[in-house]
Regions:
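Acidic, glycine/proline-rich low-complexity segments that act as flexible tails and inter-domain linkers
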Residues: 1-23, 51, 76-98
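C-terminal structural segments of small proteins and small subunits
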Residues: 67-75
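Short alpha-helix boundary/capping elements
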Residues: 10, 32-38, 71
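A generic alpha-helix surface/boundary motif
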Residues: 4-9, 26, 42-44, 60
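Short amphipathic alpha-helical surface patches that mediate protein-protein
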Residues: 64-67, 83
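Short, structured motif recognition centered on aromatic/hydrophobic residues
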Residues: 25-33, 63
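Mid-chain, well-packed structural core segment of small domains
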Residues: 35-60
């Protein structure tokens, strides 16, 4: 029941709205999840962000902005978790984001 509620609410009622692009929704989610230290969900939404058209350069800028507004340790965590995620995906994040 709970999973059904979450799926219906998040995906059908919120994500189906049309005023923000899915890419923008992904950026918003990454910011919110980073600022609240929800790192497992952050990594999950990294995959969604890539699927929604976010590129490495945009993510780098996003993480820098997160570092400014949420604190450098949070920005460091963003880069750390992104590096782990992309390593598992066989993408060299250091090369892509340098």
């Amino acid at each position: 029941d709970f999973q059904e509620f979450i799926t219906d609410y998040c995906w059908h009622q919120v994500w189906d709205k049309k005023h923000l692009s899915n890419k923008q929704k992904s950026f918003n989610n990454l910011c919110i999840l980073a600022s609240t230290n929800k790192w497992p969900e952050f990594k999950l939404h990294l995959n969604g962000a890539i699927n929604n058209g976010c590129n490495f350069y945009e993510l780098k800028e996003l993480f820098l902005q997160i570092a400014v507004y949420c604190g450098v340790p949070t920005g460091v965590e963003c880069f750390k978790h992104a590096e782990e995620f992309f390593k598992l995906s066989d993408i060299d994040i250091n090369e892509e984001m340098s």
